[in-house]
Amino acid sequence: VTSDPDRAATARMVVFPGQGSFGPITKEIVEGAMGAALRMVIERGDPFLGICLGMQLLFEHSDENGGHEGLKVLPGRVHRFPGDMPAVEGDPEGPKLKVPHVGWNDVTPTGEHFYFAHSYFVEPADPSLVMWWCRYGSVEFPATIARGNIFGCQFHPEKSQWSGLRFLRSFILGGRG
């Protein structure tokens, strides 16, 4: 665990958790020395796992906080869940789902349950980046993405009990989720 860009740049494997908001993190991480260190790890080919906001930061742009650029490692954008999504599909006049999306959801195709806590989701420009999907209301969004040594998950494996532990173990042992 480090906040030192020099230590991060020399790591053989990086797990980049994210908690908070895209705007303030952009200033601190993306535009700073840590952003350069993370890009270096990725370009070198070492395993990289972005969790929640850590995954979102891998992409080009987020609508959060008025719009900010990400690390631009992967093509795509980050969008907010609509605040008017019906809780029951096909019933636009009924109760609405709450944003943020907080709680347990299953992912496709594994069927395993993971814990999510987010208001924004990734829309990759390249759908082949997506390994697992999740649905919240009418929005199907990537639960996990992967390309080469880069891996990301929207859920919180550290809060996802056995499924999360298996996921992290798989990443640590194989450099992938």
Predicted regions span which residues?
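A general structural signal for well-ordered alpha-helical segments in protein cores
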Residues: 22, 35, 100-104, 164, ...
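A short acidic, helix-capping loop that chelates divalent metal ions and anchors anionic groups
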Residues: 23-24, 82, 152-154
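Pocket-forming structural segment of enzyme catalytic cores
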Residues: 60-138
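C-terminal and late-domain segments of enzyme folds
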Residues: 122-177
